[in-house]
């Protein structure tokens, strides 16, 4: 292999998933810039690299240096020092401040920061606070760089090196060498495969018990990401064996040890991760106890009279027989489910239930899984609705403030968008519901199930353990909406009306070519809808069936940002640039910041000096450091899965055969029902027909239904 020393001038391409990059560099002895390609996680312009590899000639792109391994050095010239300091690696120094510091100290800049940081006070604009921040950051970077050199050859980016340092401190290298699989357990974003790559290079055997244990946990974790609460023992061993390429005996030995130590829970032949097992057991036990607890006799006896009184007072609201039955059933039940599609009167029925319980002097709590769903519930009822996390008074230090020891205070809890609630969240919610309280779960059972593990609402309905009211009639005011009528047609397996009338709220634009479809979507969002309907682009949401492909959410986000918000100071991470005015989404729960997976906000400030980003989530400003930007993604486009519980004035949805692996009836139904005023599909009738007739929905491995239907009346443990 040949060794070169180069300075990065431009990064012309970088794959955020695997780190493959194309760098334009200057190399001593070459007049023109040279192309260097390889795996370069999180390198910055101005960095000086020593790279080992080989020159070759690419048929399309010409002469390139293909990197096998590399290390980063501190630059030795003025321009390089300035670029390095301004890259964001050193907290407290951005591009402008870097110019001032280097102008003052020249080639001595690094020596000053290293040995006499107080001299930075000589630079105009630098105070004692910033000096302290720079000194601490510089020391941290030295430690992180040692870790980075160690991890670099194992496919771990500098971002994750910083997270590893934050988790383990100066013991990071020792910790990773001792058991690299701890990374998969402790560091968000580092999975089993990265940890396994490190372990292999450290000489771990394929049958090592630590490797088998981590592989089993990874397999169960991946299943939970697909919605499963457990795996059958035989299938788990088979899947782990395929993943690990190890012998079966050490895998079964590791599995038996984990069951014996209660690191995994065995229920017949079903193997659970403990949180999912205890959540299922907790939900089943609490629901059964609620159902078995008697209702106050006076309330039950007055149900019919109260319903009649409420309907007379709400004369402007038309209730049909099923809705009246739902109101009476709510008064006479401890637990009830109210389900129905768009336009069937779930909100009207909920209003009737609220009015009836208020007439009875009952205290009512309203909640929903997400901030947007809670806001919609508040607007529809005129009463305060909270997210489940806020209802339960969650704080990151102590967990849920409301629980079985400190239950909720009220008589009735109504939870909207219940199909979104996974088994873990439902267990936390039910712990806080006292036996004296009534519970009504409202939702559309035909939408996508929860993103998290479980199929809670479906299991409760199918168990027959609680009364279920199904609203099916589309009310007169909703019949004029083709969003509503087409959603119901799709849900019934019928092809929708796609004739594009001028007064319609549902349009289908035919386009077979994915690239032209993407261009058309950008044109629709930027030009056609704002001009025709006088709607801001902020009220338009693009919903894609998947992330990947030309018409996937990732590519559409880049194209839409370029069209809507192309210029301004920015911070970059994961292939995206974030600017003031960008719509962004939180993609993991961050309890410290009180923002949750799926929350959408707007970037209100970008500080390129401090390398921070401020995002407004419903009026709450949250600051992100550069290393935290992987918690965000652009949200001009998002997946239909991520849109659950939200409504948007306008929805634009690509639907082409390039999405075929995701084309299912409930996916398209969920996407269409997110639109309040206008829905536009861009794609092919073939893809739409394929989705409508594809009812093959993956069955989720859960045992909640069986626990609820168990006639033995035993309490699960």
Predicted regions and their residues:
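Conserved helicase motor core of P-loop NTPases
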Residues: 445-593, 604
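Loop/turn-to-beta-strand initiation segments
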Residues: 363, 409-413, 436-440, 678-679
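Loop/turn positions that initiate beta-strands
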Residues: 46-48, 581, 598
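ASCE P-loop NTPase motor cores of helicases and related translocases
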Residues: 230, 242, 265-413, 461, ...
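C-terminal accessory regions
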Residues: 599-717
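Accessory, non-ATPase domains that flank or precede helicase/AAA+ motor cores in DNA-metabolism machines
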Residues: 1-299
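Walker B catalytic acidic pair
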Residues: 417, 443
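Short basic/glycine-enriched coil/helix segment immediately N-terminal to the Walker B
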Residues: 397-411, 422, 430-437, 537, ...
């Amino acid at each position: 292999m040949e060794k070169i020393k180069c300075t990065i001038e431009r990064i012309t391409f970088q794959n955020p998933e695997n780190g493959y990059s194309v760098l334009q560099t200057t190399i001593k002895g070459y007049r023109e810039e040279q192309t260097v390609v390889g795996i370069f996680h999180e390198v910055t312009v101005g960095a000086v690299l020593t790279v080992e590899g080989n020159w070759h000639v690419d048929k399309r792109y010409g002469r390139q240096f293909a990197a096998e391994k590399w290390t980063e050095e501190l630059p030795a010239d003025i321009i390089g020092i300035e670029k390095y300091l301004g890259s964001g690696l050193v907290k407290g120094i951005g591009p402008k401040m870097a110019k001032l510091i280097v102008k003052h100290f020249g080639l001595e800049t690094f020596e000053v920061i290293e040995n006499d940081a107080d001299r930075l006070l000589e630079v105009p604009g630098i105070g004692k606070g910033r000096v302290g921040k720079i000194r601490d950051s510089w020391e941290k970077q030295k430690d992180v760089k040692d870790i980075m050199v160690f991890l670099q050859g194992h496919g771990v980016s500098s971002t994750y090196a910083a997270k590893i340092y934050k988790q383990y401190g100066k013991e990071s290298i020792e910790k990773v060498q001792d058991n690299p699989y701890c990374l998969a357990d402790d560091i968000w974003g580092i999975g089993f495969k990265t940890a396994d790559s490190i372990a292999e290079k450290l000489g771990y055997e394929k049958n090592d018990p630590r490797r088998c244990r981590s592989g089993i946990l990874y397999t169960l974790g991946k299943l939970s990401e697909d919605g499963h609460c457990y795996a059958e023992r035989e299938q788990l061993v088979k899947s782990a064996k395929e993943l690990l390429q190890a012998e079966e005996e050490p895998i079964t030995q590791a599995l038996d040890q984990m069951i014996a130590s209660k690191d995994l829970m065995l229920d017949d032949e079903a193997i659970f991760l403990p949180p999912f097992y205890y959540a299922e057991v907790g939900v089943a036990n609490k629901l059964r106890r609620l159902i078995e607890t008697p209702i106050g006799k006076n309330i039950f006896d007055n149900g019919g009279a109260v319903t009649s009184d409420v309907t007379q007072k709400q004369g402007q609201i038309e209730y049909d027989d099923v809705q009246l039955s739902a109101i009476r059933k709510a008064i006479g039940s401890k637990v009830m489910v109210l389900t129905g599609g768009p336009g069937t009167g779930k909100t009207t029925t909920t209003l009737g239930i609220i009015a009836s319980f208020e007439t009875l002097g009952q205290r009512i709590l309203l909640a929903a899984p997400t901030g947007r769903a809670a806001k919609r519930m508040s607007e529809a009822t005129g009463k305060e609705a909270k997210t489940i996390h806020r209802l339960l008074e969650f704080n990151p230090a102590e967990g849920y403030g409301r629980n079985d020891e400190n239950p909720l205070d009220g008589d009735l809890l109504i939870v909207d968008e219940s199909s979104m609630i996974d088994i873990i969240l439902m267990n936390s919610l039910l712990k806080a519901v006292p036996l004296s309280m009534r519970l009504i779960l409202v939702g559309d059972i035909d939408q996508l199930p929860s993103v998290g593990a479980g199929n809670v609402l479906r299991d409760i309905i199918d168990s027959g353990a609680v009364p279920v009211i199904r609203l099916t009639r589309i009310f007169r005011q909703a019949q004029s909406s083709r969003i509503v009528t087409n959603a119901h047609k799709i849900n019934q397996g019928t092809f929708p009306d796609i004739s594009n009338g001028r007064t319609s709220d549902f349009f289908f634009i035919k386009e077979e070519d994915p690239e032209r479809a993407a261009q058309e979507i950008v044109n629709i969002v930027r030009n056609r809808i704002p001009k025709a309907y006088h709607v801001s682009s902020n009220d338009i949401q693009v919903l894609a069936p998947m992330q990947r492909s030309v018409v996937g959410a990732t590519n559409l986000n880049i194209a839409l940002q370029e069209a809507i918000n192309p210029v301004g100071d920015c911070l970059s991470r994961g292939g995206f640039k974030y600017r003031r005015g960008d719509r962004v989404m939180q993609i993991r729960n961050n309890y410290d910041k009180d923002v949750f997976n799926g929350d959408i906000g707007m970037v209100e400030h970008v500080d390129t000096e401090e390398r921070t980003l401020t995002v407004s989530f419903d009026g709450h400003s949250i600051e992100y450091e550069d290393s935290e930007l992987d918690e965000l993604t652009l949200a001009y486009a998002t997946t239909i899965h991520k849109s659950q519980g939200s409504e948007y004035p306008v929805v634009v949805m690509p639907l082409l055969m390039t999405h075929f692996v995701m084309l299912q009836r409930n996916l398209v139904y969920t996407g269409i029902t997110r639109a309040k005023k206008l829905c536009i599909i861009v794609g092919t009738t073939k893809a739409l027909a394929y989705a409508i007739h594809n009812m093959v929905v993956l069955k989720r491995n859960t045992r909640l239904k069986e626990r609820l239907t168990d006639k033995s009346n035993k309490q699960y443990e």
